[in-house]
Structures are given as C-alpha cells and as structure tokens.
C-alpha cells in the first residue's frame, strides 16, 4: 500500500503507570487511532538501546489525514483513560507528522533502528553504508507543516512535544543486526511489540 504519511512518536512512561499504559495502548489507543479514516497501520516498539523507552508510528494515507475532522475530534475529546495516561504516564514526548519516502521497499522486520536529525543528512547514511548494514526495509521521514496546533492531549501532558525535522527507519529481521546498525550510524535500536492494521 502506497501510504505517504507517518505519525512518529517517541516517549517514556512513568514506571508506576507501566501496566496501565500497556493495557490502554493495546486495547484503546491503537484501535481508536486505526478507526480514523486514512489510518492503515500502527506499530509499537520497545527500546533495545539507551534513549526513549518506546517508539510508535502510524502509517496514514497522507499527512492531511492528521488534520482531518475525524482525527482532530479524537484529539480534542480524550477519553477518561487517555486523560489519565497523557497527564501522568507519558514523558519526554516527541511527536511529529511526516511525509515518507520508501528507499528500500522490502518486508517489515521484527527489529528496527531510528535516527533523527536536523539540517543536512548525516554522511553516515550514504547508500553504501546502508547497503552494508543489510536492512530489509528503509524509509526516510520529513516533518510537514501539520505540526503546529497544540491539541487537548498535548495540553494534558503539560509540556510542548518535541519535534524532529528528519528521520530514517531501518528494519531488520534480527536483533543483532539492529544493534550493529545502531552502533554504526549512531541511532537507537528497537524490537517490535505489536502491530495493528486495517
């Protein structure tokens, strides 16, 4: 499916809310997001290397889906469970609407590496290095203009979300490949927790 939009999220979770956070994410948050027209897939990852604890991204038809009436209605009317999680569980939130370009169009893997940057693309991300690392799939993400509005959910978190300018996603079959790639390009390695698709 040729989806052109990404909602990319990196975050930590307060340890005392971890169990509640996981139940909420799996039984309410992912299904609710995937109910919005234009959302096709949500994937959750857990950190293998230092950095944020969690990484989640959603594939959408195009970035405009993330300013649609249906999506904004959800953001502005959080459920009681969402209010609690946003206010007390989430921290160090980095949330960005992106356009995406698929560089290597292979199957999704069970492990991944992300690297975000501002300005020029890091030299280490040259085609030769990427090929040497052997990813199954590679995508580049670029922030769009759909990142300016402060939603009710963001207000609950009590601090403005961080934003990326650009990021790369490399997907691998095995953990050792992801760890090697993260060490080589200075990124963070992840293992897949869950996928929900339409």
What does each model-identified segment do?
Residues 1-198:
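Macromolecular interaction modules
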